[in-house]
């Protein structure tokens, strides 16, 4: 069940996930869309800092961003390539 109190920031590599999360009740924002609105989110540091200042959970594929979040106790979901690979393998086994 979605928790509307969670605020989520989706890194630019997964732009569009914010819209899917919003449809199921999450408050989600896209780095790409926020940048288009004029926010200066051009570096990993600025993205992480924005998430921290706004009490957001960052969703990213960027390993360095994920590690920086961990080091600074900022909530983050790292979409690790190994996890994605496991999903691909599971799907391939269905054929």
Regions found by a protein language model. Give the residues of each.
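Acidic, PIN/NYN-like endoribonuclease modules and their adjacent C-terminal/linker elements
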Residues: 2, 11-24, 30-33, 39, ...
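A general structural motif
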Residues: 3-5, 55
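Short secondary-structure boundary micro-motifs
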Residues: 4, 41, 60-62
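Short, hydrophobic beta-strand segments that form beta-sheet elements in well-ordered domains
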Residues: 8-12, 57-60
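Intrinsic disorder
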Residues: 29-30, 61
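Amphipathic, hydrophobic secondary-structure cores in small proteins
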Residues: 49-54
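Acidic, metal-binding active-site segment of PIN/NYN-like and related structure-specific nucleases
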Residues: 55-71
């Amino acid at each position: 069940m979605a928790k509307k109190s969670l605020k989520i920031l989706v890194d630019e590599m997964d732009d569009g996930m914010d819209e899917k999360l919003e449809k199921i009740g999450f408050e989600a924002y896209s780095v790409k869309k926020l940048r288009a609105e004029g926010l200066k989110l051009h570096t990993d540091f600025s993205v992480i800092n924005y998430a921290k200042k706004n009490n957001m959970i960052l969703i990213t594929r960027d390993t360095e961003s994920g590690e920086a979040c961990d080091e600074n106790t900022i909530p983050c979901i790292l979409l690790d390539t190994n996890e994605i690979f496991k999903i691909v393998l599971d799907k391939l086994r269905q054929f």
